[in-house]
Design a protein with these regions (language model features):
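Short, cysteine-centered beta-strand-loop-beta hairpins and adjacent loop/turn segments enriched
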Residues: 72-76, 134-136
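Solvent-exposed edge beta-strands and adjacent loop segments
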Residues: 1-69, 99-117, 123
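C-terminal or internal capping secondary-structure element at the end of a domain, subdomain, or sheet
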Residues: 121-136
Length: 136
C-alpha cells in the first residue's frame, strides 16, 4: 500500500538560534528532491560512433514545503525563518509525515520567504547539504 498525506510538522535545531517547530497547512502538496547525483538529459551526449556520454552532476537536495501556518501575533514564524535563512550556520531539520516517515538533514531556508497576511501562511523552500536522509 502507498500512503501519502499531510506533513505533520517540520522541526529545526540551530546551534545559535535554538530550536522550533513549524506546522504546515493540511491538504497541501510538498515536493522533496533528496539530492545526489543526476545524469544530464542531453540529446547530444553521444559520440560519433553512437556510444553514450554520461555526464553526472550533483543535485542540491531540497524540500518545497506545503504552506507554513503563520501566527503573526505570538510565534512569528516568518521572523524565525528569516533569521535561519540569514545566519551563516545551517540547522538540523526533520520533516514528519502523517504516514509515520521522518526525513531530515542539515540545511537552511532559501529563496523568497514571503508571508500572506490574509491567509496567515508562509512560502518556504529548504535546501540541504548532501542528501535528505530517511530517519524512520
Amino acid at each position: 500500500m502507498f500512503v501519502g498525506g499531510d506533513i505533520i510538522e517540520i522541526k529545526y535545531n540551530h546551534p545559535i538560534l535554538g530550536s522550533g517547530t513549524l506546522y504546515c497547512k493540511a491538504g497541501e502538496d510538498g515536493t522533496m528532491d533528496r539530492g545526489g547525483f543526476r545524469t544530464a538529459d542531453d540529446a547530444n551526449a553521444v559520440t560519433g560512433a553512437g556510444e553514450m556520454i554520461v555526464q553526472l552532476n550533483r543535485s542540491l537536495a531540497s524540500f518545497e514545503t506545503p504552506p507554513i501556518a503563520w501566527d503573526m501575533t505570538d510565534k512569528d514564524e516568518l521572523e524565525k525563518i528569516n533569521k535561519l535563512a540569514g545566519h551563516p550556520l545551517n540547522a538540523d531539520w526533520t520533516i514528519t509525515s502523517v504516514n509515520g516517515s521522518i526525513y531530515g538533514g542539515k540545511g537552511r531556508p532559501v529563496g523568497e520567504i514571503t508571508g500572506n497576511t490574509n491567509t496567515a501562511q508562509i512560502t518556504l523552500k529548504l535546501a540541504f547539504e548532501g542528501e535528505i536522509k530517511k530517519i524512520s
